[in-house]
Amino acid sequence: QNVEVEITESVFFDNQPRLLDAIRHLHQSGYRILLDDFGTGYSSMAMLKDMSFDTLKIDKSFVDNIGDERGNKIVDGIIRLAESLELSTIAEGVETREQYEYLKAHGCDVIQGYYFGRPMTAESFEMLLSSQTAGR
C-alpha cells in the first residue's frame, strides 16, 4: 500500500497484453498505479476506462500554461476528470506561486516542483533537516 508504480503513457502505445496484465496484477496486489505525463502523448479515454489507476500526474507542459485562459481550462479539466473517476492528482513542475495557488484552489491533491525546492544531494538534505530541527 506504500509502493507506487509510475507508468508513462508511452507504455500503452504498444498495448502489449502481457504488460497490461502485469500492471493489472500489480494493482490487484495493492500497488498504487500512477499515470505519468497524462495527456502529453498516447493517452486515450479508453485507457482510463480499461486500466485501474490511482493517480493522474499532470505534466509540466500543462502546468506551464497556467495563467493562460485555455491552459487553465485544460488543467481544470484534468483535475475534474480525475475527481469524477475517483483518482487523485499530482501536478508536476510547479515553479511559481501563481501555478501553486491555481492548483491548490482547483483541488489538485499533490503539488510538486521547484517552487518548493530544487534537487539536492543527500548531504544538503541532511543539513536542511538539521537546520529546521534545530530551529524548533
What are these regions (language model features)?
Residues 78:
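Aromatic/hydrophobic pocket-lining residues that form π-stacking "cages" and hydrophobic walls in ligand
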Residues 1-66, 81, 85-119:
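The catalytic core of metal-dependent phosphodiesterases that act on cyclic dinucleotides
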Residues 70, 104, 120-136:
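C-terminal helical cap(s) of enzyme catalytic domains, especially alpha/beta-barrels
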Residues 19, 71-75:
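Short, conserved glycine- and acidic-residue-centered signature motifs
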